[in-house]
Design a protein with these regions (language model features):
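Active-site-proximal beta-strand/loop segments in catalytic clefts of secreted hydrolases
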Residues: 117-119, 167, 195-199, 207-210, ...
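Structured C-terminal helix/loop/strand segments within mature extracytoplasmic catalytic/sensor domains
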Residues: 2-106, 124, 209, 215, ...
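Active-site SXXK
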Residues: 122, 134-164, 309
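A conserved catalytic-loop motif detector
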Residues: 238-290
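Active-site-adjacent helix/loop patches that line small-molecule binding or acyl-intermediate pockets
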Residues: 78, 82-94, 166-167, 180-258
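Structural recognition of the beta-strand scaffold that forms the well-ordered cores
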Residues: 113-116, 136, 194, 228-230, ...
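Charged, often glycine-rich, active-site loop that binds/positions anionic groups
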Residues: 127-131, 170-182
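Short, conserved catalytic-motif segment at the N-terminal edge
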Residues: 103, 108-132
Length: 350
């Protein structure tokens, strides 16, 4: 009896052991498969993130649902329709929306260059960002930053007034007016204000003299970034790329306290024009640049989630290298593109 009980018990344990072994054989492949799937997902996620960080037309990294995007679209629809700028912002990338507008306006793809970066997520978009564009007066922003660096290093004083009677100039009449208005000498804060708020040339040349002249100043622009294009910063021929300038804006953003005076001046510059033309009740720090065929603007836009944008254009409104006046059509189109970029940001990123 006891022998039979032991035998039965041994058989029972053997059956249980065999069942566990079989179960293990079934479960282990599932675990292995799950680990392989997780590894594949991790690799795919890593590749996706890497792609998004480059300036491509990748899908925006936005946590907003389609319902949330449509809600903003409906809220902003009256303004969109009034401006004639109703586009499918929620279902298009930023370059796609801008390209659609350009197609509607008959603007050639080569006429627009921009770089955009959302400062919260790091999402970037660009169009023709390595294409050489005429910089206009946008060089005056990094020029002012260089002078602030010298002041911070104790090499220049904000109180001292510097002689401007022999300063280089582009227009003699403007130069003579400044000499008369400031009794032949300007302080650095005066130079900053008039070169940034009003984008005047004489105070910009006076700032450059504090650094050793324009050639020396231009050679230092690489402090704030370098483009992957042939033109690395801003050339002495007044050419640049948005790939470079977006780095200048990010450097400015990351050092706001140091450059607070610059931010103030570009914050009050050109009210109702350039990036501010159709964007009301919104704080915008902008440095426009106009010369001949070029109408440009570089901006830090204080939306709910701030972003930076470098927008450069050529030949808008029929302007040419021989143009001496700003094209009314061209300046309006710059404002419309600014609205489109901002609306896309509101819908997808805010």
């Amino acid at each position: 009896m006891i022998k039979n009980d032991i035998k039965n018990l041994a058989c029972w344990f053997g059956g249980v052991f065999l069942f566990i072994c079989c179960l293990g054989l079934l479960v282990e492949p599932q675990r292995a498969g799950k680990k392989m799937a997780e590894a594949s997902q991790s690799i795919a996620s890593s590749q996706s993130t890497e792609g998004e960080e480059t300036r491509t037309e990748a899908t925006a990294r936005s946590s907003k649902t389609m319902e949330e995007k449509q809600e903003v679209m409906e809220q902003d629809l009256p303004t969109m329709e009034a401006l004639g700028l109703s586009y499918d912002y929620a279902n298009m990338t930023l370059p796609q929306v801008v390209q659609t507008y350009m197609d509607d306006m008959g603007i050639d793809p080569s006429q627009i260059s921009f770089s955009y970066k959302d400062l919260t997520s790091g999402q970037t978009y660009a169009m023709n960002d390595t294409q050489s564009m005429t910089a206009g007066s946008t060089y005056k922003l990094p020029l002012n930053m260089l002078v602030v660096d010298e002041v911070a290093a104790g090499k220049l004083s904000l109180e001292e007034r510097f002689d401007i009677t022999n300063t280089s100039y582009e227009y003699k009449g403007e130069h003579d007016n400044y000499v008369a208005a400031f009794n032949g000498a300007m302080s650095i804060p005066d130079m900053q204000e008039y070169s940034l708020v009003y984008s005047e040339n004489t105070p910009a040349y006076a700032l450059a003299e504090r650094l050793g002249g324009m050639d020396k100043a231009y050679s230092m622009f690489g402090r704030y970034g370098r483009s992957k294009a042939k033109v690395k910063t801003i050339s002495r021929e007044n050419k640049t790329t948005t790939d470079y300038y977006i780095q200048v804006l990010e450097y400015l953003w990351n050092n706001q306290e140091k450059y607070k005076d610059i931010l103030y001046f570009i914050g009050v510059s050109f009210p109702g024009e350039y990036y501010k033309r159709y964007l009301y009740d919104l704080t915008i720090y902008q440095k426009p640049g106009y010369v001949r065929e070029a109408l440009n603007v570089d901006a830090i836009v204080m939306e709910e989630k701030p972003y930076i944008v470098a927008l450069y254009t050529a030949y808008l409104g029929g302007s040419t290298e021989a143009s001496e006046e700003i094209s009314g059509v061209g300046i309006d189109q710059v404002g419309q593109i600014a609205y489109i970029i901002n609306e896309w940001h509101r819908v997808n990123m805010n």
